[in-house]
């Protein structure tokens, strides 16, 4: 009886001891594995991002130099501050249009994928236009599906100026203004001039 009792007593303490030893080893080893893996992952992500930023930043710097030396008619654009990816643009209402005399401010945001993805361009100044909504979003094909890396921000601004001269009621962003443009042009033009005077001068 005493021998059996001794075996029973010895058995748990031996297995318990080895189990504690295993646990201590696994606890000590696992954090090391967890620390090493994320570092490798972060390194890969940052190198890809750095390459994208380098490519896009060079292209944006080049376009900035070009638009500074030779800006499109009635347009100007450049970085808001130190961030090369955030620009502010000014467009003067085209002469002879219902927006003549207005000064319109736009925000331009380039992504790290530029020029392979279009810039985001929005009006900050309110404007009465069937292709520009109240949030300043512009319905322009080259800012969507017809974008090409061969295009530049200068060409985008020229296209926006053309849109101010000749709107596209066939592809409207604001249906009510497009309908008014086609059915009551005089009232449309009166409203557009009124908004220009109120918000853009």
From Swiss-Prot:
One BP annotation, GO: positive regulation of G1/S transition of mitotic cell cycle
Pfam families per UniProt: UQ_con (PF00179)
Matching Gene3D superfamilies: Ubiquitin Conjugating Enzyme
GO cellular component, one term: nucleus
Active-site residues annotated for this sequence: 139 (glycyl thioester intermediate)
Compositionally biased spans, kind Basic and acidic residues: 1-10, 21-45
EC annotation from Swiss-Prot or TrEMBL: 2.3.2.23
InterPro entries per the UniProt record, alphabetical: UBQ-conjugat_E2_core, UBQ-conjugating_AS, UBQ-conjugating_enzyme/RWD
The UBC core domain, residue ranges: 55-201
Alphabetical keyword list: Acetylation, ATP-binding, Nucleotide-binding, Phosphoprotein, Transferase, Ubl conjugation, Ubl conjugation pathway
Residues annotated with N-acetylserine modification: 2
Spans annotated as Disordered: 1-55
Enzyme class: transferase
Catalytic activity: S-ubiquitinyl-[E1 ubiquitin-activating enzyme]-L-cysteine + [E2 ubiquitin-conjugating enzyme]-L-cysteine = [E1 ubiquitin-activating enzyme]-L-cysteine + S-ubiquitinyl-[E2 ubiquitin-conjugating enzyme]-L-cysteine
Entry GO MF terms: ATP binding; ISG15 transferase activity; ubiquitin conjugating enzyme activity; ubiquitin-protein transferase activity
Post-translational modifications reported in the UniProt record: Autoubiquitinated in vitro.
Biased composition (Low complexity): 46-55
Pathway linked to the protein: Protein modification; protein ubiquitination
Function, as annotated: Accepts ubiquitin from the E1 complex and catalyzes its covalent attachment to other proteins. In vitro catalyzes 'Lys-11'- and 'Lys-48'-, as well as 'Lys-63'-linked polyubiquitination. Catalyzes the ISGylation of influenza A virus NS1 protein.
Family assignment from sequence similarity: Belongs to the ubiquitin-conjugating enzyme family.
PANTHER family: UBIQUITIN-CONJUGATING ENZYME E2
Protein name: Ubiquitin-conjugating enzyme E2 E2
Organism: Homo sapiens (Human)
């Amino acid at each position: 009886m005493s021998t059996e009792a001794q075996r029973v007593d010895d058995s748990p303490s031996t297995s318990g001891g080895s189990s504690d030893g295993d646990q201590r080893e696994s606890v000590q080893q696992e954090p090391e594995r967890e620390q090493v893996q994320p570092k490798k992952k972060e390194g890969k992500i940052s190198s890809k991002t750095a390459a994208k930023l380098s490519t896009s930043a060079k292209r944006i710097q080049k376009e900035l130099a070009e638009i500074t030396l030779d800006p499109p008619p009635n347009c100007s654009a450049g970085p808001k501050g130190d961030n090369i990816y955030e620009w502010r643009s000014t467009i003067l209402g085209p002469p002879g249009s219902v927006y003549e005399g207005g000064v319109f401010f736009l925000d331009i945001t380039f992504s790290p994928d530029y020029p392979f993805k279009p810039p985001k361009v929005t009006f900050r100044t309110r404007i009465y236009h069937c292709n520009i909504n109240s949030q300043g979003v512009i319905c322009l094909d080259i800012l969507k599906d017809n974008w090409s890396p061969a295009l530049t921000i200068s060409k985008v601004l020229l296209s926006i100026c053309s849109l101010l001269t000749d709107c596209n009621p066939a592809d409207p962003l604001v249906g009510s203004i497009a309908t008014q443009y086609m059915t009551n042009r005089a009232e449309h033009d009166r409203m557009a001039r009124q908004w220009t005077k109120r918000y853009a001068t």
